């Protein structure tokens, strides 16, 4: 539960139609399994105690009394499981029969949530048996509870007393499929997790529709959504039920059970992440909570005592063992088809952004420094796409290679080959003499290879590009990527500056993927030479090449040895900015995700380095050139990330 992780389960138990005794044993068995797995919330299907397909038997007193007696036994069996549980059954009160979710924990029935919308169309004819629940919540006598009563109504939220933001509400099957689901109101009243007890029959194509519905609702509500539906064991007189269970979090499917086989899926929902998203989205209004009853519940042994960074003892929530995983490259889709599609989208967005800027300024030429590295290669690809969109010749792309002390043969020749294969104009301007003259002018020893030595080269290159832009009447296109901007690994008013930065919201790991995608595309189009040079650029170690090469003509200046592995930095960047993760949580999930690649000590080292750089280098980001947003994370000071340049980062370094 520490860091907001709550382990939840969606269960499809084995059942028999109208056999409450068998179903009781099956439900209790699955409850105990979920508890053993550490689940703190378990959701069972609609009408689980009796089965959904009882038909006219729902009107029989014999079945209703058996269902109620079974519920009481199941609630007794929940003692000691320390788990909030949702189970469906038919329940009669005030002369009407309701389809309800019984919500209980450790022997106490906390409430009953009746189904709001009763379907009576196609294969569904629930209105023949059940009444919809409208009106306000009310109290029901329930002598088994210590209070002697329980709550009844569909405006109930079950709120944990110890765990901030853990507020759970329920809806039942059809409630989700209507124009305005009850869960909309639940979320607006503060619920962060929705339990849906369902009995959704299978027909051709319904699986995808159901998946999209659950996934979309969790995204719309910025909520966790636990969807448990009935499966094998229901009557097959007219229908088949597949047990298609889903657990989603803010539009992301965390767990999905294969259909046509009963069983349980368990994962963790991150309620802190959901709370962060709701804080950020000011259109996510909290309203209507006055009409809700908030029912407290608590868990046993949720706290432990640990020493903090200052050596003082403090009470903290226990750490939940995690079953869920986190993508190592969060900026890149894991599925190849989706990866290829998104790569095309990103390059198109970049190109369209530049197209508008060139059309607005009336410029016909684009000036770009071409180093033979990843960033400038991607920029060149984007500029070519822009020129094609504008109907201009690619010869209007003025690619400038500016070798100096640290330029290697590999990057130099790759820049030349790339310009040739892209069909763009290449100019070579050696800046060694200019830099040496400048260093002499300021009295700097050329043998002192400090930051002045390095930055003088970067600023000289920018000056050359700016002057050429004047010469051609064109725009200098920035090549720096978002990872470099996050780390401040850019020379202020050097490569940091341009007239339009096409890579400003592209992290380094995504830059590599986009160039790799371009290589694959070139090969498909029969452009093997272009594909080969792009592939070699992808495989070239990242380096600014600002320090002199060794005797073999190779650079010993490796960027990732200075600032840390980009896969780690991009992982940190995404989870910090996108989800607002606190440092110890980010460290924890990084250790889990990269356990096979880095030691905990290495991860801690680079995480602290990331935070130090991120805060210290904001002043560079505060004056960034314009550039298009392409993903959910960007550091534009005019857009998504407005941070003061003099903010203190001590809290993130403790």
List the predicted regions and their residue ranges.
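Enzyme catalytic cores with a strong preference for nitrogen-chemistry domains
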Residues: 1-367, 385-394, 426
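ATP/NTP-dependent adenylation/nucleotidyl-transfer catalytic domains that generate, transfer
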Residues: 23, 164, 223, 235, ...
């Amino acid at each position: 539960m520490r860091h907001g992780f709550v382990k939840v389960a969606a269960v499809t138990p084995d059942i028999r139609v109208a056999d409450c005794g068998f179903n009781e044993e099956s439900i209790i068995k699955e409850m105990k399994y979920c508890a053993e797995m550490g689940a703190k919330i378990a959701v069972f299907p609609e009408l689980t105690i009796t089965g959904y397909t009882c038909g006219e038997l729902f009107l029989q007193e014999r079945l209703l009394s058996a269902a109620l007696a079974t519920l009481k036994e199941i609630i007794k069996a929940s003692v000691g499981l320390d788990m909030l549980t949702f189970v469906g059954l038919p329940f009669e009160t005030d002369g009407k029969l309701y389809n309800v979710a019984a919500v209980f924990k450790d022997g106490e029935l906390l409430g009953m949530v009746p189904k709001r919308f009763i379907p009576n169309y196609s294969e569904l004819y629930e209105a023949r048996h059940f009444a919809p629940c409208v009106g306000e919540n009310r109290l029901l006598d329930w002598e088994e509870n210590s209070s002697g009563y329980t709550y009844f109504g569909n405006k109930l939220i079950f709120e944990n007393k110890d765990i901030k933001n853990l507020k759970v509400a329920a809806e039942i099957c059809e409630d989700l499929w209507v124009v305005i689901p009850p869960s909309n109101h639940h979320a607006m009243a503060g619920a962060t997790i929705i339990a849906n007890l369902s009995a959704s029959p299978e027909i051709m194509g319904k699986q995808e529709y159901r998946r999209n519905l659950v996934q979309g609702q969790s995204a719309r509500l910025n909520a966790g959504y636990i969807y448990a539906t009935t499966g094998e064991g229901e009557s097959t007189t007219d229908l088949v039920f597949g047990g298609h269970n889903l657990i989603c979090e803010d539009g992301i499917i965390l767990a999905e059970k294969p259909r046509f086989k009963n069983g349980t899926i368990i994962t963790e929902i991150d309620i802190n992440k959901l709370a962060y998203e709701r804080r950020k989205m000011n259109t996510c209004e909290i309203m209507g909570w006055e009409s809700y009853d908030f029912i407290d519940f608590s868990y046993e042994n949720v706290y432990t005592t640990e020493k903090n960074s200052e050596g003082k003892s403090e009470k903290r929530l226990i750490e939940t063992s995690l079953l869920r995983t986190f993508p190592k490259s969060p900026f890149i889709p894991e599925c190849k088809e989706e990866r290829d599609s998104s790569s095309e989208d990103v390059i198109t967005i970049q190109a369209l952004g530049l197209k508008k800027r060139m059309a607005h300024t009336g410029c016909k030429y684009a000036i770009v420094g071409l180093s033979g590295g990843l960033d400038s290669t991607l920029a060149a690809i984007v500029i070519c796409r822009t020129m094609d969109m504008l109907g201009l010749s690619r010869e209007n792309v003025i690619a400038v290679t500016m070798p100096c002390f640290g330029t290697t043969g590999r990057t130099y020749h790759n820049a030349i080959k790339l310009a040739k294969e892209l069909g763009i104009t290449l100019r070579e301007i050696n800046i060694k003499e200019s830099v040496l003259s400048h260093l002499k002018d300021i009295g700097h020893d050329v043998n002192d290879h400090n930051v002045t030595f390095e930055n003088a080269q970067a600023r000289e290159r920018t000056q050359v590009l700016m002057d050429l832009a004047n010469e051609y009447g064109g725009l200098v296109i920035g090549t720096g990527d978002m990872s470099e901007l996050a780390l401040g690994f850019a020379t202020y008013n050097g490569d940091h500056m341009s007239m339009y930065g096409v890579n400003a919201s592209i992290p380094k790991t995504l830059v590599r993927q986009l160039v790799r995608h371009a290589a694959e595309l070139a090969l498909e189009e029969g452009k093997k030479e272009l594909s080969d040079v792009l592939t070699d650029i992808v495989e070239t170690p990242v380096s600014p090449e600002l320090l002199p090469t060794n005797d073999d003509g190779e650079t010993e200046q490796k960027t990732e040895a200075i600032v840390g592995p980009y896969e780690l930095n991009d992982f940190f960047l995404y989870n910090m900015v996108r989800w607002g993760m606190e440092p110890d949580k980010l460290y924890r999930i990084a250790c889990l995700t990269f356990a096979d690649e880095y030691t905990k000590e290495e991860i801690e080292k680079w995480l602290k380095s990331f935070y130090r750089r991120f805060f210290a280098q904001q002043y560079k980001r505060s004056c960034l050139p314009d550039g298009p947003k392409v993903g959910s994370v960007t550091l534009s000071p005019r857009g998504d990330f407005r941070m003061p340049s003099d903010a203190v980062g001590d809290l993130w370094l403790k």
